[in-house]
Amino acid sequence: MTKNNILKIEIVLKEFGLTNLGIVVFNNRFLKKYDIAMLIGPDEPFFWDIFKKSKEFTSGVKNPLNKWSKRIIDSIAKKFSGTAFYPFQNNPIIPFYDWALNTGKFWQSPVKLLVHERRGLMVSFRGAIAFENRNNLNIQKKKNSPCLTCSAPCVRACPVNALNNNKYDVKSCMQFISKSKNSICIDGCLVRRECPIGKSYRKIEQSRFHMKHFINEVYK
């Protein structure tokens, strides 16, 4: 893997509304095989309009975003001789949170959610592509967390404090959202939306899609 190859991958990702969120270099080879992995997420606000035109979205299949992500990222991984991994797979379960913290692009926020240098708390992963050869690729050293100079509006944003006390209170969150179809949270998690970094990138329609899917997953 070289810087030139990374640029080529980023160009292809952009065609599908995706972006390179950071690269993790493994101290010990992942699965005794892979040296590095590129974390991939939506390139917002462009991502949503591209995904809406996909066959997965328009056909009404179950879990359209996961199916679309797998189709697209699998094809990109194959093109560049990598292997794709996903946050929704089970075997093996991929530690995206830990990987992200080792890219130099992410930090743990005061509410424990990951915060990205450009995407803030709205960051999300669609997948990762792992490669076997690092080729002396140098990864940017980690900067100071942007949270150090932030007033942390995320801490006070949740109406039921579902993300305090170092845990996520799913029950309280779901009960509040389910009280009304017009819940203030249906347009996206208030905690995530309060982060000043990248808060204007995500479209409301996309946030609604994610929240409705999240609710359906909890109550299925």
Segments from the language model and where they lie:
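Non-ligating segments of multi-cofactor redox enzymes
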Residues: 1-220
